[in-house]
From Swiss-Prot:
Residue spans of biased composition, Basic and acidic residues class: 185-210
PANTHER family tied to this protein: RIBOSOMAL PROTEIN L25/GLN-TRNA SYNTHETASE, ANTI-CODON-BINDING DOMAIN-CONTAINING PROTEIN, RIBOSOMAL PROTEIN L25_GLN-TRNA SYNTHETASE, ANTI-CODON-BINDING DOMAIN-CONTAINING PROTEIN
BP GO annotations: translation
One family name in Pfam for this protein: Ribosomal_TL5_C
Role summary: This is one of the proteins that binds to the 5S RNA in the ribosome where it forms part of the central protuberance.
Subunit structure: Part of the 50S ribosomal subunit; part of the 5S rRNA/L5/L18/L25 subcomplex. Contacts the 5S rRNA. Binds to the 5S rRNA independently of L5 and L18.
Gene assigned in the entry: rplY
Protein's name in the database: Large ribosomal subunit protein bL25
One annotated Gene Ontology cellular component of this protein: cytosolic large ribosomal subunit
Gene3D superfamilies: Ribosomal protein L25, beta domain, Ribosomal Protein L25, Chain P
GO MF term list: 5S rRNA binding; structural constituent of ribosome
Amino acid sequence: MAVVLEAKERPDKKHSTLRRIRLQGNIPGILYGKNIDNQMIFVSGAALEKTIREGGRHSLMTLKIGEKDYSVLLREIQRDPLRGNILHADFQAVDMSTEVDIDVDVRLIGEAAGEKDGGVLQQNLHQLTIRVLPANIPPSIDIDISHLQIGDTVTVGDINTGGKYEIIDDPSEVIATILPPQQEEEIHSGEQQEPGHPDAEEGRETTPES
């Protein structure tokens, strides 16, 4: 069930209006989509942050504006580069019977067998683009890596979608791999040197013993 987020219309996009909205703890935004007029809105900052935290950045939401409900996706958010708080949000109204392209987070589950043997997990992809009906958008794409040995990889093509969505990314792209353990650098070489008689350094003059 989609999370319900209440929104109100805002009169304009003047800087003074936007500033007042933010000072009141709200976030200005816009609602757009096929067959609807763009609407300038604002939502509660705390409510939006909670929705993202609990449902995920790309989850389906119900945006309630007055007596009307819209099924929406949060397509873009702008954050303050220093404080990290949300400054603006773009909501796209979607048709529940039409597939959408959306980025979904990749989550690796478990500890790889190769890690227990000293291998190093390297994750190359943290998001995948999928084509899916809005009601079937997963909160994340979970991949069990517990069986991976050193040298093993997981590619996009290895993911079982269960027929619920299509992955747009190239099937050959590597999502994660288990690298061999880093070899400890040898401190001593195999050659032995007589004490008190270091080898001559290249480019340095030496005086033969008399």
